[in-house]
């Protein structure tokens, strides 16, 4: 496949400079990929060490599409979830700015499906950081007809996912930048930020501190 450094076209406009995407390793995938993602143009190349490289243009496009999708729902009816510690702070910061419901850590079975439970949550849209670790929430959403947005790696299972955002969903830098971009783009779509206006905090503020578990 093509060399990974040749993808960005001169003058092409992205949500952030290409160098920032690369520095945060947003394009790095796993050493395994599935045909579903390959056929849809999400995977751009394979490095000599076997790591898949995501198509940067598709990442950028999907962040924009996801932001538009999120704005269709009342913020309080959108749940953002992950069991991955590296996603906790990005999710909490995203929800702080956007007004969505952050649910981090283990999801108690029945949270989305059993209205008789005291911990039941009634939502219209679910977003998760990793289909592999957040499968409980995805399965419950599928049973109740709740659409799902998910950050997907090259080896992620697309089952029950309505909108995929291809990206490195394991790294602390990548998760921070993607959720920062999503928050900024949602606020731009709502008109709460001007088209070229940034959040009042840098993307680094969305990042989990060094030393926190990544399991």
Curated annotation (Swiss-Prot):
* One Pfam family matching this protein: Ribosomal_S2
Q: Which GO terms describe its cellular component?
A: small ribosomal subunit
Entry annotated with the keyword Nucleus: no
Q: What is one GO biological process annotated to this record?
A: translation
Q: Which UniProt keywords apply?
A: Ribonucleoprotein, Ribosomal protein
UniProt-listed CDD domains: RPS2
InterPro entries from the UniProt entry = Ribosomal_uS2, Ribosomal_uS2_arc, Ribosomal_uS2_euk/arc, Ribosomal_uS2_flav_dom_sf
For this chain, one GO molecular function annotation is: structural constituent of ribosome
PANTHER family membership: 40S RIBOSOMAL PROTEIN SA
Recorded family membership:
Belongs to the universal ribosomal protein uS2 family.
- Protein's name according to its UniProt entry: Small ribosomal subunit protein uS2
Upper lineage: Archaea, Thermoproteota, Thermoprotei, Thermoproteales, Thermoproteaceae
């Amino acid at each position: 496949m093509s060399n990974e450094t040749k993808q960005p076209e001169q003058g092409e406009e992205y949500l952030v400079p290409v160098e920032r995407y690369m520095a945060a390793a947003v394009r790095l995938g796993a050493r395994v990929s599935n045909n579903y993602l390959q056929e849809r143009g999400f995977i751009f190349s394979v490095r000599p060490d076997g790591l898949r490289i995501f198509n940067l243009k598709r990442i950028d496009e999907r962040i924009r599409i996801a932001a538009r999708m999120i704005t269709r729902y009342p913020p309080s009816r959108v749940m953002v979830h992950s069991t991955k510690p590296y996603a906790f702070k990005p999710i909490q910061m995203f929800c702080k700015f956007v007004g969505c419901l952050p649910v981090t850590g283990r999801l108690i079975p029945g949270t989305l499906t059993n209205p008789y439970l005291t911990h039941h949550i009634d939502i219209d849209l679910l977003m998760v950081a990793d289909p592999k670790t957040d499968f409980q929430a995805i399965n419950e959403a599928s049973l109740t007809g709740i659409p799902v947005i998910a950050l997907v790696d090259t080896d992620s299972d697309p089952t029950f996912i309505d909108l995929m955002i291809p990206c490195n969903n394991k790294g602390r830098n990548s998760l921070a930048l993607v959720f920062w971009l999503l928050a900024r783009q949602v606020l731009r779509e709502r008109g709460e930020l001007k088209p070229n206006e940034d959040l009042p905090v840098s993307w680094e503020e969305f990042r989990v501190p060094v030393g926190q578990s990544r399991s």
